[in-house]
Each structure stands twice: as structure tokens, then as C-alpha cells.
Amino acid sequence: MRAEVRRGLLDTNILVLRRGIEPAELPDEMAISAVTLAELSAGVHLVDGDDAPARAERARRADVLQRAENEFDPIPFDSEAARMFGRISAAVRASGRTPRLRVADLMIAAVAATAELPLYTTNPDDFAGLEEIVRVVPVRRPLQ
């Protein structure tokens, strides 16, 4: 009897915090979306300042981005995910929340839904109202 292999899509926050996350909380087969690479890339460029702490933060973010690029072949946000994004936006609005403020999160959820993968995140509340569309797997945030 073989154990079932767990597969899942990682939210961007998992990649940012991954070194401190217990490996047993993550799926055996991990995937990311192209949206996650976009968020990580933007993060490198959005660090303000040129002092030592800003340079260190920029380097840390660049390291996370480079590791993600080397480890994963991201799942694209394609036309099927775009259609799913509409359904997800409607579900978020029906739950009383504003989809416009959370576009990247909802695009990642759309990729997870169309790829039929559970979404692993340290921010499960970001995906409230989507329970009928995508399975969200909460992951504990590492202690800072």
C-alpha cells in the first residue's frame, strides 16, 4: 500500500517565510503560480531607500525570488484561470469583502482552482468566502 502524495499550490507568503515553516506542513509536491513570481519580483523593486537595512531587505527578497525561479516551473495565469477569477471575485463580494483590494491573492486562488490543487497559505483569512471553490490549507506562521 502506497502513501498518497500530497500536492499543492503555495501562496506567496509561504515562499517568503519558507525557511521557518515546518516541512511537514507543506505538500510533498509543491507548485507556484506565475502570479507568485510577479509578486516576488515586485517585492524586490518596492523596497524604499538605499541605506544598509534597505539594501539587506532588497537582497533578501531577491534571494527568495531567485530560489523560486530555480526551484519551480510556475503554473501560468491562463484564460481558464481568468474565467475562474471572475467567479472568485463574485464569491468574495458575496461574502461582504472587496475583491479589488486583493487581486493577486484572488488570481493565485484562481490558478489553484483551475489546477485542482489545494492552496497552502499562512493567511487563510485572505481566502475567506472561497470554500466552495478552492481548498485552503492553513500553515502556521514561523515564530519571528
Residue ranges and their predicted role:
Residues 2-8, 18-110, 128-144:
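PIN-domain endoribonuclease scaffold, especially VapC-family toxins
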Residues 113:
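Anion (oxyanion) recognition and catalysis
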